[in-house]
Regions:
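Conserved ABC ATPase "signature" region
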Residues: 40-58
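Conserved ABC ATPase signature
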Residues: 62-66, 70
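H-loop/switch region of ABC-family ATPase nucleotide-binding domains
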Residues: 123-124
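Catalytic Walker B motif of ABC-type/P-loop ATPase nucleotide-binding domains
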Residues: 87-90
Length: 197
């Protein structure tokens, strides 16, 4: 519905399939043109979006010539230029290498912190995104849904990133959500093991 278009932005997992223009700048402006925003507002928002997502140097580049991570950031930027309150991302890191995935997740984090946008991510690679999440939803096979802090949900779910599985096996509380968390939790164990040699 039209009223949701102003509030919710959606980015699919294949950004190139969703692009409707040829260049970065045109793509960032397209959604605003469809909403009938004045030219001066569009120009200002395009500049802000280019800066916020770190793609200003790509302004005149053809979308098809961008890397996967750059395409994903432009797709997110094109949606964000319309100023939605909620951003829905379908597997935003699925086709990206680890470095590009980190760049996209850093851009998403900036959106949350700088603009106060609510971001909903559907992702199979939990290890990439769980450390960024404030809340998690786990959809059980029987149709029920568990909701809570990521550590609460992952403590009992049948699906968890390897670092969480390690935390379960080691009996760590709280469970680590990132490798950094696991290193902190393992520090006392490393010290004990170092004392034995």
């Amino acid at each position: 519905p039209r009223e949701l278009a102003d509030r919710v932005g959606v980015v699919g997992q294949d950004p190139l399939a969703g692009f409707v223009t040829d260049t970065v700048e045109e793509e960032l402006a397209y959604g605003m043109e469809q909403l009938g925003l004045p030219g001066d507002v569009m120009r200002k928002r395009v500049e802000e979006t280019l800066d916020l997502l770190g793609v200003a140097d790509l302004r005149h580049r053809a979308l098809r010539d961008l890397s996967g991570g750059q395409q994903q950031r432009v797709a997110i930027g094109a949606v964000m230029a319309t100023h939605p309150r909620v951003l829905v991302l379908d597997e935003p890191t699925s086709a990206l290498d680890p470095t590009a995935a980190e760049e996209v997740l850093a851009a998403i984090t900036r959106l949350v912190h700088d603009l106060g946008v609510t971001v909903l991510i559907a992702e199979h690679r939990l290890e990439r995104v769980v450390q960024y999440a404030d809340r998690a939803l786990y959809l059980h096979g029987d149709g029920t849904v568990a909701s809570g802090r990521p550590a609460e949900i992952l403590a009992t779910s049948s699906v968890a990133p390897p670092v969480v599985e390690l935390g379960r096996l080691a009996g760590w509380d709280p469970l680590p959500m990132s490798v950094r968390d696991a290193r902190r939790a393992a520090a006392p164990l490393r010290e004990r093991l170092a004392g034995r040699t």
